[in-house]
Swiss-Prot record:
Protein name listed in UniProt: Complex III assembly factor LYRM7
Entry's family note: Belongs to the complex I LYR family.
Quaternary assembly: Interacts with UQCRFS1.
GO cellular component: mitochondrial matrix; mitochondrial membrane; mitochondrion
Gene that this sequence comes from: Lyrm7
Keyword NAD part of the UniProt annotation: no
Amino acid sequence: MGQPAKVLQLFKTLHRTRQQVFKNDKRALEAARVKINEEFKKHKNETSPEKIKEMMKLGSDVELLLRTAVIQGIHTDHDTLQLVPRKDLLTENVPYCDAPTQKQ
């Protein structure tokens, strides 16, 4: 896959992730859309392969961070937030054991 195709794929992936992460939050959806479009337009004439690779890495990292670390909160009262985790953020509750396993 050529570099322009990879850039376009990252652009689309960021927008899909934005739609999932900020679902039902019009203000956050619009702000994220504007920021993504602004950053891509700002660098659309970049020709240096190293710089493009660096920016692609940054975009991929941002997408991963949005997907794995952002959770929505809804104001339900004056000082109360209700967290709305997405299904892909939930993990099974696994027992924690800090003792090393014994070799036999």
